[in-house]
């Protein structure tokens, strides 16, 4: 079996990691071993935080809806309960956007929820 020289493949693999580490401070962008650790950690954080982002946005929407619904004399849970009973299928993202951009429209939706409680 002939000898395999892997210089090109190894260099390409290292350069790929160093390219991902571009912009990191100090040795983390220059030395392969430090760059590998930094890139692995960064990719792990990125994977985890793509999931956390969804939770954070949902919590933000709920906070905004709660603040707007309390201005209309309802708690968040009562508002959602009333909307479910009234078969209003507006998700929390849209409700939060309405609460911020169109308070008058949100108060109309809140009045629909109030009638169902």
UniProtKB/Swiss-Prot annotation:
GO terms for molecular function: rRNA binding; structural constituent of ribosome. One of its GO terms (cellular component) is ribonucleoprotein complex. One of its GO terms (biological process) is translation. SUPFAM superfamilies: Ribosomal protein L20. Gene3D superfamilies: 6.10.160.10, Ribosomal protein L20. The keyword Ribonucleoprotein applies. Keywords: Ribonucleoprotein, Ribosomal protein, RNA-binding, rRNA-binding. PROSITE patterns: RIBOSOMAL_L20. It holds the Pfam family Ribosomal_L20. CDD domains: Ribosomal_L20 (cd07026). Binds directly to 23S ribosomal RNA and is necessary for the in vitro assembly process of the 50S ribosomal subunit. It is not involved in the protein synthesizing functions of that subunit. PANTHER family: 39S RIBOSOMAL PROTEIN L20 (PTHR10986). HAMAP family: Ribosomal_bL20. Belongs to the bacterial ribosomal protein bL20 family. This is Large ribosomal subunit protein bL20. The gene is rplT.
